[in-house]
């Protein structure tokens, strides 16, 4: 493997995957040398690459008949040879063997063939294009821009238009061009007549195409993206962006040899139905720039890395005949520096359009649009004839970006064709149009340009427009321009040829202002109309130094605004003050619609009102400004400068840097030219409006840039300024007195003022001053921005008065205010009928209080509003800005009542302090209006008012009279008093209810006392009653004293401060009863309440009685008891008993609930502990390898306070099972113990054993890793069930293979390798079934795992039966002889190729002679036949062994013929069968080398996996205990009797695998089975063998090894042997004489006797 091949592997793999994905292959290839060995994959790739031809049917037929892989590869190579490919160096054997060089050579041939096909297709389509067709009309409605272009030619290369086909891109990887299927893209051309471009992969520099640039980084100094979007075909919004350079503009000069030629750019029409999507046009708020590259000659790079990049340059020319080889200097054209701008635009390779149906006027062709490679390169483009280069733009604004929107321009006179394109804005680029490929589509696919004719390749300098054009702060749109003129043919209709390429640059930096007039055209917010380019009559436009962006007028703006602009009566704001405009929305677009701008006058250093108004217009794109209002603002512009000066003078006179309101009023009084406005007739609303507006404007003076909230440090004023300030302060006081008498301001409300209410969520930045249409009302309202911008609100005037923090304000909710929040148009004009406007004048220099204004005349209250809530208060800007509140303000008590009681609500004060639910923003909470007044001037005031009391001023100005002031306070107090009365009444009713209950009970006690008094009781009964009464008295006294302490601070009345003044004597006495009622709520006092209530009542009764007489003076009770009525006493006692019983039951229930809560809490803790342990196990599994230790070593330590079921999984498999049950992904792995040794799809649950769970494979996993994991899992399983390793099974050698669904895998066999990736096949529901070696492989691995017997033992038995043909299995009862015999018979039948019917089971009857004769005949017949069958004689009775011997004696012995015979007997003393009839005897021990342990462990592991329950560690100790107990039993049997009667392991195989269940089961087994059987065996042994020696009780051994720690001791639950009568005493044994002859005769008599087994 060479280095070059290694480098080419990923390239070829990617190439093959890309083409195979077009076919039916759903998964990608990973290893080409291995995957392409399959002829099916090779043929599929060939079918994708090679189109259908005359050899295809034969190739398909041959593939259908292929039977081997080599034949398929040979068929594929023959097919390629027929196609003309050189396959001489390729052989099928090399490909089949996975030779990398051969596979790479094959792929190289296919890629080369693919390139040839593309080249032929491209050349064919070039020939099909007609050069005389006429371009169909374009659908673009965008203005015709001009594009400053440059070009270089390549005349030195005569074959530049027919490039050579490059070699395969796989060998030298290039930037691939994705082939875009037009059917997938969804282009549905309607009237288009253009042929779609061919998909070219050549690397010629002479093939023309658009090439995109990389994305702009947003830096102003980096070239921005020139992009167009396919979605823009149906859009009429902004364009894709070309940003101008953020540097000083230079004057454009004519070059020495301006020799350029126009490139005809053809475009498709009706692209509106195209489904092509394009990248989003990024709208950036910053300046972007266009990187331009001077036109230089670029060498041919056809063989280079960028060979696949097709290039195109757009350029213009004056003289097409002349040429120059020298590069041209870089210059700026139009709005950007006149350089040879490279429009790096990408588009898909195919546009999917149909061939043209009409003739073109000149030679045009479709360009190859390629995928961009992120690099900047200069492009070469050939030049076409001179007649195609004559194109210019007739635009009214010198290459302005959106000049002429919605305006009709002359039709284009270009006859050859047009390039029309809709582009998309950044807002519409994220539409629902689907993009077929984000890699290939970076340009509108409708722009397809090509140049067919080979032209002289001489560098030509661009046509430089000799116009000094400065940098435009516009969205620049450039068009193609040429000064050459050509008359249009008469057949061309208007608007059919519109070479429009819309490119938008979000240039928002208003760097330069121009003094040249700019003609403004009125834009309309409708669908944009097309702007045609006329090439015939284009007069030279005057040079422009700068284009000033005008504000976008609103849709609601009447046309008179444009008239005013043209007449020069008003001046539009030309600059954003204090910040740089950072939006590229419709504001900038409309601004470019004007061609002239009147320069504004220079603003003052302190930011006059004119500048602030200009800022207002900049901040808002579509305000509700009327024409008359704008005219009035313009008229007032110069006059308000003087007010600004007064503002500064007033500001210097106050230490808090706040202006006094009187300065503005004085200024207004001194200027009578302002529409005859005077301050004498100013109403309260109007004067407050003027003062507030003055203060607000002073706020803008302090913060000219809106970027800092620090107030300016005031300078010390002179004496003249101080005196003037004091005089102005006096004017304020007198103006306020006039405001109280004027009602004019409350009567008029401007319609325009309604628009001051904005929708919630917008911030107010500056005031807006406008005059209504009738020029009678001037309105000031908040100026809110319709969209978010970078402006920050300036917070000023945050200087609070001393008592302002405690002031509040309430707002009323009216339908007018709510309507204003939704839309300003919903505010009715008749609101003045319901409200009389009032304003608050709060001079910022007043640092002690708040000035409130209120009109005197009575006003009709609003609906849903109390008469008291009638004052509208407006704050000065000194208060912090708040959001607008939907409620109106509510008037409160003036400041002079500040000493009212504490409980009265203090809701007066400043506007900012009174805003409880949020106030309006600054001074714009209400609409401010200035009305036209008379010429009366305000009188002068004395300077002494400065030292007057501001509190008195507030008290005199807040209300019209003292009567109204006190009436308002009385109304508030009356309302509060009414609330208190309601509270007192409700509490009194409650106390009366309690008193009624108390009276009722007292009546019952009184009645009881009367009965006692009237009754004549016996002395002893009277004494008993007296004792009871005394006892009740003591209890009641004690309870009363306790309740007195408990009632302190309790109850609602005790918390009321006015309890004594409103509560009655009865309510105060019944407070104890109220507290007793509260005690009834608690559970602990349930049942005691009634009793304590009764006892307190009895105590009070006895106290009243004791005041009059004591017990000695009580009348004696004598006489009969027949008149006593005990009903009431009995009822009371019964009620007490019921209460006590109910309390007792509740307490019991409470205890039960507490107990349940404790149980649940313990359960939760257990679950938490288990969850933590499971998480730890999961972490171990995910972090570490899947390994498993033995069962004993892996089970964690369980502490004493934990239960066994809280333990986590003890091994990996158990953890995985728990993880699977909890929803985690894992794969179940089973092993099949079928002795056949074949991988079968038949699932037998009895033969399936779960060995564990496998973790989900990863993307890096392969099938070898799966093999290793499965074998490791099986090895761990064997280590768990066979701890001693007695089975002798090798986990890695005993597994044949595994099956996954229909897929089979034989381990070690490469032919059965699964081609699919493991992650594609293995899921959480998949089961991997392993199969072990068996009879088919002449091995016994599956038989050993099924029987759990040692492998050597099984091999010996199989060898015996195959060689001897007759086998006897002898052993004790319960060892498993019958199952082993049947399994061996089945194994032999498979091993000898016999069917299952060949196994014959013969049961020998014990007593029935007729059946015995039938069995004898049948058995003899089978033995005499020569057919190979297997006979099973299971469990031969003890008295029929002679019968079996006689049957075999009658049949002669045949060595290699006859049936196989397997017999099972309970004893092995059968020498006749072994000696005379060639039987192989196999004696099975009762221990079976740990059979019990292996069987029970396998059961435990099986339950662990199936039930997903972890086995406790104590269970494995219990499993180890069973062989010890069984061995103790068998040792006792062997001592007292013979081995024949020992107990096999079957008795312990059915043990429950739980700790408690196994304990109870073993106790029952020992007491009910083992002890009786041992006693019987011992007695039979004494009779048979005379064994009466001493013995050891096995119960002692069992008690010593007892594994259960819970429960009683084993000595207490286990029975012991009762064999005292069998043990001889020492005295008797000494007297008895042993007779050996008698003993020998007895043994001989019972030699062949057997004892029945239990």
Curated annotation (Swiss-Prot):
Keywords: Calmodulin-binding, Coiled coil, Developmental protein. InterPro entries: CH_dom, CH_dom_sf, Nav/unc-53, P-loop_NTPase. Pfam families: AAA_lid_NAV1 (PF25408), Ubiquitin_6 (PF23092). Residues 162-174, 244-261, 595-607, 747-769, 779-799 have a biased composition (Polar residues). GO terms for molecular function: actin filament binding; calmodulin binding. The keyword Coiled coil applies. It comes from the Eukaryota. Residues 143-161, 197-243, 310-327, 407-429, 705-722, 1061-1083 have a biased composition (Low complexity). Residues 128-261, 274-364, 381-440, 480-501, 595-626, 650-680, 698-729, 747-799, 1059-1083 are annotated as: Disordered. Involved in the migration and outgrowth of muscles, axons and excretory canals. This is Adapter protein unc-53. It comes from Caenorhabditis elegans. The lineage of its organism: Eukaryota, Metazoa, Ecdysozoa, Nematoda, Chromadorea.
């Amino acid at each position: 493997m060479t280095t070059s091949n290694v480098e080419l592997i990923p390239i070829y793999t990617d190439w093959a995957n890309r083409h195979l994905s077009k076919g039916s292959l759903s998964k990608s290839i990973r290893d080409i040398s291995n995957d392409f060995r399959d002829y099916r994959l090779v043929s599929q790739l060939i079918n994708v690459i090679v189109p259908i031809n005359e050899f295809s049917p034969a190739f398909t037929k041959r593939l259908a008949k292929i039977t081997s892989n080599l034949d398929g590869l040979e068929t594929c190579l023959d097919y390629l040879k027929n196609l003309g490919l050189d396959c001489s160096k390729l052989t099928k054997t090399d490909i089949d063997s996975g030779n990398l060089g051969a596979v790479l050579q094959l792929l190289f041939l296919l890629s080369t063939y693919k390139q040839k096909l593309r080249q032929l297709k491209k050349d064919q389509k070039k020939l099909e294009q007609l050069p005389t067709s006429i371009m169909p009309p374009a659908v673009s409605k965008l203005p015709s821009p001009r594009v400053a272009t440059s070009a270089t030619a390549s005349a030195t290369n005569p074959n530049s238009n027919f490039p050579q086909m490059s070699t395969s891109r796989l060998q030298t990887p290039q930037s691939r061009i994705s082939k875009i299927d037009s059917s997938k893209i969804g282009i549905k051309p309607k009237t288009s007549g253009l042929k779609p471009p061919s998909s070219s992969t050549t690397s010629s520099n002479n093939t023309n195409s658009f090439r995109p640039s990389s994305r702009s980084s947003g830096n102003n100094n980096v070239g921005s993206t020139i992009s167009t979007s396919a979605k823009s075909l149906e859009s009429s919004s902004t364009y894709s962006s070309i940003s101008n350079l953020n540097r000083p503009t230079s004057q454009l000069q004519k070059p020495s040899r301006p020799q350029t030629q126009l490139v005809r750019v053809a475009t498709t029409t009706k692209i509106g139905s195209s489904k092509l999507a394009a990248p989003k046009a990024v709208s950036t708020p910053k300046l972007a720039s266009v990187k331009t590259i001077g036109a230089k000659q670029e060498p041919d790079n056809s063989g280079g890395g960028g060979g696949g990049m097709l290039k195109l340059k757009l350029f213009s020319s004056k003289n097409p005949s002349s040429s120059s080889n020298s590069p041209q200097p870089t210059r700026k054209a139009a709005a950007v520096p006149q350089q040879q701008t490279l429009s790096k635009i990408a588009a898909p390779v195919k546009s999917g359009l149909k061939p043209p149906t009409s003739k073109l006027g000149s030679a045009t062709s479709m360009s190859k649009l390629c995928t961009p490679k992120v690099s900047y390169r200069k492009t070469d483009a050939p030049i076409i004839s001179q007649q195609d280069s004559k194109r210019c733009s007739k635009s009214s604004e010198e290459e302005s970006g959106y000049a002429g929107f919605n305006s009709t321009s002359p039709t284009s006179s270009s006859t050859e064709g047009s390039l029309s394109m809709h582009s998309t804005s950044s807002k519409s680029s994220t539409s629902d149009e689907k993009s077929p490929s984000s890699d290939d589509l970076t340009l509108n696919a409708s722009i397809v340009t090509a140049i067919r004719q080979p032209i002289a390749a001489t560098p030509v300098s661009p046509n430089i427009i000799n116009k000094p054009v400065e940098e435009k702060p516009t969205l620049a749109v450039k068009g193609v321009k040429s000064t050459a003129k050509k008359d249009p043919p008469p057949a061309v209709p208007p608007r059919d040829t519109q070479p429009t390429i819309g490119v938008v640059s979000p240039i928002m930096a208003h760097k330069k202002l121009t003094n040249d007039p700019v003609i403004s055209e009125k834009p309309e917010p409708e669908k944009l109309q097309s702007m045609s380019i006329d090439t015939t009559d284009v007069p030279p436009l005057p040079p422009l130094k700068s284009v000033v962006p005008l504000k976008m007028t609103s849709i609601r703006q009447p046309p008179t605004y444009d008239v005013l602009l043209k007449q020069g009566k008003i001046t539009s704001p030309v600059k954003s003050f204090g910040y740089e405009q950072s939006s590229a929305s419709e504001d900038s677009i409309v601004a470019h619609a004007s061609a002239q701008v009147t320069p504004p006058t220079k603003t003052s250093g302190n930011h006059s009102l004119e500048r602030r108004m200009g800022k207002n217009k900049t901040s808002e794109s579509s305000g509700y400004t009327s024409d008359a209002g704008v005219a009035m603002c313009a008229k007032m512009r110069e006059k308000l400068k003087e007010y600004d000066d007064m503002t500064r003078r007033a500001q210097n006179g106050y230490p808090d840097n706040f202006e006094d309101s009187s300065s503005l009023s004085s200024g207004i009084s001194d200027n009578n030219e302002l529409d005859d406005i005077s301050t004498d007739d100013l109403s309260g609303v109007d004067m407050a409006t003027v003062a507030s507006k003055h203060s607000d404007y002073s706020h803008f003076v302090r913060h000219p840039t809106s970027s800092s909230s620090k107030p300016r440090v005031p300078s010390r004023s002179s004496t003249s300024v101080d005196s003037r300030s004091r005089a102005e302060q006096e004017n304020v006081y007198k103006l306020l007195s006039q405001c109280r008498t004027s009602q004019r301001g409350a009567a008029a409300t401007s319609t325009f003022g309604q628009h001051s209410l904005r929708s919630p969520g917008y911030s107010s930045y500056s005031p807006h001053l406008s005059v209504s249409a009738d020029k009678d009302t001037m309105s000031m309202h908040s100026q809110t921005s319709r969209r978010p911008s970078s402006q920050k609100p300036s917070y000023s005037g945050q200087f609070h008065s001393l008592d302002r923090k405690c002031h509040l304000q309430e707002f009323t909710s009216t339908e007018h205010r709510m309507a204003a929040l939704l839309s300003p148009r919903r505010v009715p004009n008749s609101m003045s009928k319901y409200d009389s406007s009032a304003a608050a004048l709060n001079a910022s220099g007043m640092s002690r209080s708040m000035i409130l204004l209120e009109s005197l005349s009575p006003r009709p209250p609003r609906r849903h509003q109390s008469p008291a809530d009638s004052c509208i208060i407006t704050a000065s800007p000194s208060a912090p800005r708040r959001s607008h509140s939907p409620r109106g303000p509510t008037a409160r008590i003036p400041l002079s009542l500040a000493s009212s009681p504490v409980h009265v609500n203090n809701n007066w004060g400043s506007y900012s302090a009174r805003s409880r639910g949020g106030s309006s923003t600054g001074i714009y909470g209400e609409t401010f209006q200035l009305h036209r007044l008379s010429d009366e001037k305000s009188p002068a005031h004395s300077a002494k008012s400065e030292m007057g009391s501001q509190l008195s001023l507030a008290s005199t100005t807040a209300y019209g009279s003292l009567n109204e002031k006190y009436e308002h306070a009385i109304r508030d107090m009356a309302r509060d008093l009414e609330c208190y009365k309601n509270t007192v009444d409700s509490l009194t009713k409650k106390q009366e209810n309690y008193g009624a209950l108390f009276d009722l009970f007292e009546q019952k006690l009184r009645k009881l006392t009367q009965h006692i008094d009237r009754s004549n009781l016996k002395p002893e009964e009277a004494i008993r009653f007296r004792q009871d009464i005394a006892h009740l008295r003591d209890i009641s006294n004690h309870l009363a004293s306790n309740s007195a302490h408990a009632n302190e601070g309790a109850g609602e009345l005790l918390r009321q401060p006015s309890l004594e003044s409103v509560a009655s004597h009865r309510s105060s006495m019944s407070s104890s009863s109220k507290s007793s009622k509260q005690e009834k709520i608690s559970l602990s006092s349930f049942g005691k309440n009634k009793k304590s209530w009764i006892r307190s009542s009895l105590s009070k009764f006895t106290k009243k009685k004791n005041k009059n007489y004591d017990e000695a003076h009580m009348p004696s009770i004598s006489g009969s008891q027949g008149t006593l009525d005990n009903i009431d006493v009995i009822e009371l006692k019964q009620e007490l008993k019921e209460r006590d019983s109910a309390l007792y039951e509740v307490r019991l229930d409470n205890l039960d609930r507490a107990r349940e809560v404790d149980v649940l809490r313990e359960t939760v803790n257990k679950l938490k502990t288990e969850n933590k342990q499971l998480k730890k196990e999961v972490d171990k599994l995910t972090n570490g390898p899947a390994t498993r230790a033995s069962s004993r070593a892996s089970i964690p330590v369980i502490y004493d306070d934990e239960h066994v079921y809280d333990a986590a999984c003890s091994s990996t498999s158990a953890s995985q099972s728990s993880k699977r049950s909890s929803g985690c992904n894992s794969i179940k792995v089973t092993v099949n113990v079928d002795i056949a040794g074949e991988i079968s799809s038949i699932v037998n649950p009895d033969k399936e054993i779960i060995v564990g769970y496998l973790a989900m494979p990863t993307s890096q996993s392969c099938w070898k890793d799966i093999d290793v994991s499965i074998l490791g899992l099986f090895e761990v399983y064997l280590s768990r069930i066979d701890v001693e390793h007695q089975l002798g099974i090798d986990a890695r050698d005993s597994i044949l293979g595994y099956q996954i669904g229909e897929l089979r895998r034989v381990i070690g066999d490469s032919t059965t390798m699964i081609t699919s990736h493991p992650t594609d096949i293995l899921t959480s529901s998949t089961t991997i079934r392993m199969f072990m070696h068996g009879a088919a492989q002449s091995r016994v691995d599956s038989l050993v795992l099924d029987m759990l017997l040692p492998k050597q033992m099984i091999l010996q038995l199989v060898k015996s039966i195959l060689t001897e043909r007759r086998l006897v299995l002898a052993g004790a009862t319960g060892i498993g002889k019958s199952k082993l015999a049947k399994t061996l018979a089945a194994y032999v039948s498979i091993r000898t190729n016999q069917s299952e019917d060949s196994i014959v089971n013969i049961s020998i009857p014990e007593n029935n002679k007729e059946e015995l004769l039938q069995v004898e005949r049948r058995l003899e017949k089978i033995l005499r036949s020569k057919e190979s069958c297997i006979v099973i004689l299971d469990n031969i009775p003890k008295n029929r062994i002679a019968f079996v011997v006689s049957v075999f004696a009658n049949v002669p012995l045949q060595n290699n013929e006859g049936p196989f015979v397997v017999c099972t007997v309970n004893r092995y003393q059968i020498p006749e069968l072994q000696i005379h009839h060639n039987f192989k005897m196999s004696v099975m021990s009762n221990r079976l080398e740990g059979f019990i342990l292996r069987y029970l462990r396998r059961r435990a592991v099986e339950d662990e996996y199936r039930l997903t329950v972890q086995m406790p560690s104590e269970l494995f100790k219990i499993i180890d205990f069973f062989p010890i107990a069984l061995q103790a039993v068998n040792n006792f049997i062997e001592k007292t009797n013979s081995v024949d009667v020992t107990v096999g392991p079957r008795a312990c195989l059915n043990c429950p695998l739980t700790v408690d269940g196994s304990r109870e089961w073993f106790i029952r087994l020992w007491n009910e089975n083992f002890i009786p059987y041992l006693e019987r065996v011992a007695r039979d042994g004494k009779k048979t063998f005379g064994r009466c020696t001493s013995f050891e009780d096995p119960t002692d051994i069992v008690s010593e090894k007892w594994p259960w720690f819970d429960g009683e001791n084993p000595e207490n639950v286990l029975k012991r042997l009762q064999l005292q009568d069998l043990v001889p005493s020492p005295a008797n044994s000494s007297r008895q004489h042993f007779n050996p002859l008698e003993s020998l005769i007895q043994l001989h008599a019972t030699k062949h006797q057997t004892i029945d087994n239990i």
